[in-house]
């Protein structure tokens, strides 16, 4: 079986927020309903996520739409098309970078311009946290 990083990214699905006792068998059972599987890999250290590779890209997309937010292995799971270095980003494909949960598309270095890259950075000054019995968000000033 190939290492999970060598799987076909067009057919690879990221499964997040899995319980620590999630088994390969349970995940196979949930995902095989959408099409034939090539590989299933469940993280053990740290636990909480898995990758599932389908034979066909369309089955992976169907499973992603159907299973995202459903309960599996005792928790409500997050299911997304996986992303990685070998995915063709020129077509605008992307996704989460794994456990970050951002769900944002990533911009490749070649697609960035100096103005785009520098406009994404801000100076944050005067961070203040007020004491309270209830957690309060930090207040800050942005200087553009």
From Swiss-Prot:
Annotated Pfam families: RRM_1
Tissue: Ubiquitous.
Keyword presence, Phosphoprotein: yes
Domain RRM: 11-84
Sequence segments annotated as region (Disordered): 78-115
Keywords in alphabetical order: mRNA processing, mRNA splicing, Nucleus, Phosphoprotein, RNA-binding
SUPFAM superfamilies linked to this entry: RNA-binding domain, RBD
GO cellular-component term (any): nucleus
Record note on modification: Extensively phosphorylated on serine residues in the RS domain. The tandem heptapeptide repeats in the C-terminal domain (CTD) can be highly phosphorylated. The phosphorylation activates Pol II. Phosphorylation occurs at residues 'Ser-2', 'Ser-5' and 'Ser-7' of the heptapeptide repeat and is mediated by P-TEFb. Dephosphorylated by the INTAC complex when transcripts are unfavorably configured for transcriptional elongation, leading to premature transcription termination: dephosphorylation is mediated by the mts/PP2A component of the INTAC complex.
Cited function: Contributes to the activation of female-specific DSX splicing in vivo by recognizing the RBP1 target sequences within the purine-rich polypyrimidine tract of the female-specific 3' splice site.
Protein name: RNA-binding protein 1
Biological source species: Drosophila melanogaster (Fruit fly)
